[in-house]
Amino acid sequence: MTALTTEARLELVDAFTGLGYKVYTAVPNVPTAKSIVIIPDTPWITPSRIGSTLNYEVFWKVIVTVSPRNNDAAQLDSENAVDTILAAIPNPYTFTRVGPPQLTDVGAQGTVITTEINVSVRMKEN
């Protein structure tokens, strides 16, 4: 049996695959520009169990990275990435917040621009 959290994460991976971004299902050592990183949000799981069936809402951070090449192009790339990803979020997932683009240092590899999208979905055991 696959965990409900795993099912939820993999549904997002499937939705984002083919959009032109490298999709990471866990935190990479070094995120590349033009990628999507899916990680647990806080809270990660909010239970709502009634009876014996497992039932909860799971929350994810979808972090989009783009190259910081120059300010104008990076801003446009971030805006286009957000629109593309929001359109690809499947039903019944909801997005609750989109953070502003920000420079993120990734060590010796330099910096990337990251934008955080918060999504959630209710999962129920069959």
Where are these regions (language model features)?
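A short glycine-rich, His/Asp/Glu-containing loop-to-beta-strand
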Residues: 34-37
